[in-house]
Regions:
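Anionic, Ser/Thr-rich low-complexity intrinsically disordered regions
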Residues: 1-180
Length: 180
């Protein structure tokens, strides 16, 4: 397996930096030669946007039972796609990141961490009435920042800090990721 260094952003066996991950969340089109983890992360944001929209449709006033059932089926489909994308990230990690025996084991796979960050990215943007990516799924009303929006952004910042610490610990062989 290849040696990884935190902050490298190419597809040569290194984990993407937190800034590259956040840029991928915002972008809808991958740059040429984009890292496979970033492409999956970009798609996870889109899944979370679609999921949020489906829930809004199902919870709309006077939503018919057919509409609610359709939204439920759509959420199931989206969740299967999220699982596939998380698995793609985890397979890439297993194939490309050196795992040092004896290093502390992290409790989540990298795919699960990135999926959680993508979900919080979408929630934080929607709390401000902003689209989560450059390709919004629907128009959002402008909103005034409130305590809920602040909480989402603080939590996203905490997740970003945790991701940065995790990839640094992996690169320095202090932590290893579970391989499923």
């Amino acid at each position: 397996m290849a040696t990884a260094y935190a902050g490298d952003n190419d597809a040569t066996g290194a984990l993407p930096s937190v800034s590259a991950l956040l840029r991928a969340f915002r972008s809808t089109t991958p740059p040429p030669g984009d890292h496979p983890v970033l492409e999956a992360a970009r798609q996870l944001v889109h899944c979370h946007e679609l999921r949020r929209h489906a829930y809004r449709e199902a919870q709309a006033p006077k939503a018919s039972s057919a509409r609610v059932a359709g939204a439920s089926r759509l959420v199931d489909h989206i969740d299967r796609e999220r699982t596939r994308l998380v698995d793609c990230i985890d397979v890439w990690v297993a194939d490309n990141i050196a795992h040092r025996e004896g290093a502390s084991l992290h409790t989540e796979t990298l795919g699960a961490v990135i999926d959680r960050m993508a979900g919080k990215w979408v929630a934080a943007h929607h709390a401000l009435g902003l689209p989560a990516s450059n390709h919004p799924t629907d128009e959002l009303p402008a909103s005034t920042p409130d305590g809920e929006a602040h909480l989402h952004w603080v939590r996203l910042a905490e997740l970003a800090d945790g991701y940065k610490d995790l990839i640094t610990d992996i690169a320095e062989h202090r932590r290893r990721l579970p391989v499923f």
